[in-house]
Amino acid sequence: MANSAGSKKRARQAVKSRAHNGSLRSMVRTYLKKVDAAIEAGNQADAQAAYVLATSKLDKAADKGLYHKNKAARHKSRLSAKIKALA
């Protein structure tokens, strides 16, 4: 339990940031699923368009510290390889 005023404030802020970060992570996962769905459908044009949006969201999330930069790079690399395999 937080005792000092500062630690109580940090606890309040942690609750808010956890909810916000969860929302951002969910958004990134949704964009990644859209790319996977386009790949499964075999539509390279849609997959490429979704990939551009997903990489933008993923990079922004990595810049904010929601994901490690290497994890973002790994996701991008694997999706890119799947899209190239469609051709």
Curated annotation (Swiss-Prot):
Keywords: Ribonucleoprotein, Ribosomal protein, RNA-binding, rRNA-binding. Residues 7-19 have a biased composition (Basic residues). Residues 1-22 are annotated as: Disordered. InterPro entries: Ribosomal_bS20 (IPR002583), Ribosomal_bS20_sf (IPR036510). GO terms for biological process: translation. One of its GO terms (molecular function) is structural constituent of ribosome. NCBIfam families: S20. The keyword rRNA-binding applies. This is Small ribosomal subunit protein bS20. HAMAP family: Ribosomal_bS20. Binds directly to 16S ribosomal RNA. One of its GO terms (cellular component) is small ribosomal subunit. Belongs to the bacterial ribosomal protein bS20 family. The keyword Protein transport does not apply.
